Regions:
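Histidine-anchored nucleotide/phosphate-binding helix
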Residues: 27-38
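Conserved beta-strand positions in the Rossmann-like core of class I SAM-dependent methyltransferases
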Residues: 44
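Short phosphate-binding/catalytic loops that engage adenosine nucleotides
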Residues: 41
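Short, electropositive, low-hydrophobicity segments enriched in small/polar residues
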Residues: 14-15, 31
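A short, glycine/small-residue-rich beta-strand->loop->alpha-helix junction that serves as a flexible
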Residues: 17-28
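Ribokinase/PfkB-type carbohydrate-kinase core domain
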Residues: 2-13, 24-25, 47-53, 58-146
Length: 146
């Protein structure tokens, strides 16, 4: 059987919730990766990752041999989302990250692209599904040259 291939570009963030209490590393990009790996898809994942977040993703990939390729743009510290409860509006501490946009040009690939806090991703692909992840001022996909 042929494995479906998809590229995901998205955030990997630390999520802290008070009630119920949890402290996990996910974010929209990493959550999508976990879901698609569980469905048997082969995934190329592009994200801004701290050393700690990269180690967590590599541990998750261990359960799915040959399904996940991780392309890291390194950052010093992960962004943290603090929630009082799971459906609450998160508090995101101020942060300053000076990074360049992630560039991916794979015209034969399908992409799932999430807006990220660190920087935009510039994507050229066959089919692209884009979720800007911004409730107040979402950017159009083409605004950054994608």
């Amino acid at each position: 059987m042929h494995q479906q291939q998809i590229s995901i570009i998205g955030g990997t963030y630390v999520e802290h919730c008070t009630l119920p209490q949890w402290y996990e590393t996910y974010g929209s990009g990493s959550r999508a990766v976990s879901t698609l790996l569980a469905l048997g898809c082969k995934v190329d994942f592009y994200s801004y990752l701290s050393v700690e977040s990269e180690a967590i993703l590599n541990a998750r990939a261990y359960a799915h041999p040959d399904q996940l390729n991780i392309y890291v743009t390194p950052i010093e510290q992960s962004v943290v989302f603090d929630y009082l409860y799971p459906l609450g509006i998160p508090s995101i501490p101020k942060f300053s990250i000076d990074v360049t946009p992630i560039h991916v040009n794979k015209d034969s690939y399908n992409f799932l692209v999430f807006g990220m806090l660190e920087a935009d991703a510039i994507i050229h692909g066959n089919k692209v599904v884009y979720d800007p992840q911004h409730p107040d001022a979402p950017k159009f996909f083409y605004e950054n040259g994608s």
